[in-house]
């Protein structure tokens, strides 16, 4: 699940942030990107339900997988075990981006964003941008946009003193995510979901 993946990434990268140097973190990032890419390539196909991450989820979790097809005996989890390697790589890039800000080098964020976007686009010619598999190309592409957004937010809020309107959501991201799920369940249970789609979103 999403929260389980967030917890794993937070814990693993948190340990690296406290107990390792930058060189070790970069080495781990490269090993994750190229190691996961090699595993995906060795898996033979990236087709839904038949790719290596889905096969691993089926082998480990069986019919307890998030999605399980009883007809084929195949399982799939968009936040599965093997694809967490890609999510760990994304988290490590975030760690290094934060280090640029802490060390007083915010100007490097935008060039880094451009490099990541270019690398992600090039990598996607081999392995496509895919969120469910969290492919290495998806890691680089989304990290590029995230760094560009971080640079822009830093310039507008920290440098130009714009009001930090989204700060409450940023510092309470887990609460906001869980709250959105609770809200959906409440709307479904009270019939409000159908009313919204019939009267507001339609």
Language-model features: locations:
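Alpha-helical transmembrane segments and their immediate juxtamembrane cytosolic regions
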Residues: 1-202
């Amino acid at each position: 699940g999403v929260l389980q993946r967030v917890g794993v990434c937070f814990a693993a990268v948190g340990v690296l942030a406290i107990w390792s140097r930058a060189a070790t973190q970069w080495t781990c990032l490269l090993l994750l990107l190229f190691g996961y890419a090699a595993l995906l390539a060795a898996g033979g196909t990236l087709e839904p339900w038949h790719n290596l991450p889905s096969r691993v989820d089926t082998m480990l979790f069986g019919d307890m997988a998030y999605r399980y097809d009883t007809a084929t005996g195949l399982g799939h989890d968009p936040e599965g075990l093997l694809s967490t390697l890609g999510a760990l790589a994304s988290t490590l890039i975030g760690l290094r981006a934060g280090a640029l800000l802490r060390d007083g080098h915010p100007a490097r964020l935008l060039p880094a964003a451009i490099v990541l976007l270019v690398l992600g686009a090039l990598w996607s010619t081999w392995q496509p941008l895919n969120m469910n598999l969290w492919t290495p190309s998806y890691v680089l592409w989304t990290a590029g946009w995230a760094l560009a957004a971080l640079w822009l937010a830093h310039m507008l809020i920290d440098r130009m003193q714009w009001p930090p309107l989204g700060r409450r959501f940023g510092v309470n991201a887990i609460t906001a995510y869980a709250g959105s799920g609770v809200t959906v369940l409440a709307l479904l249970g009270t019939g409000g979901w159908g009313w919204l789609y019939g009267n507001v979103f339609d």
